[in-house]
Amino acid sequence: MVTSVLSSVTISRVSSVLNRDVKQFGKQFLFDGREETCWNSDQGSCQWVLMEFPQNVLVSQIHLQFQGGFSCQTCALEGCYKDGELVKIADFYPEDTNTLQKFTFAEQSVSKLRVSFLNSTDFFGRITLYHLDVLG
């Protein structure tokens, strides 16, 4: 049985926030469990979300829920230990849909995990993400 490895002490960073409006579109809305809030990236290619855990965690699944039209066709999952360089764990390919999508990959032990959104379905490269969870 897999469970979320995210906690209140997980540190997160994002590549950008739409119009720098963190009160309305900030990274905190990725993890709040509410259906009506979301993280919106600003325009530009290769948006990302980075999570830093207080200790090494085992990860084997990622759950994402995009807004259709503002999703990503190719994502890269990278991880490392505390001071190491990020290395690729897996590529995965979400659909352009509003539904929760789940992706499973070989279990990895990491203290940092980055999800990179390599090509947005939006013409301007924006990503709108309502839910992000990492399980292991």
Swiss-Prot record:
Disulfide bridge positions per record: none
Keywords: Nucleus
Gene3D superfamilies xref list: Galactose-binding domain-like
Subcellular localization: Nucleus
Chief location category: nucleus
UniProt protein name: Nuclear receptor 2C2-associated protein
Keyword flag Nucleus: yes
Record's function text: May act as a repressor of nr2c2-mediated transactivation by suppressing the binding between nr2c2 and its response element in target genes.
SUPFAM superfamilies: Galactose-binding domain-like
Similarity field: Belongs to the NR2C2AP family.
One GO CC annotation: nucleus
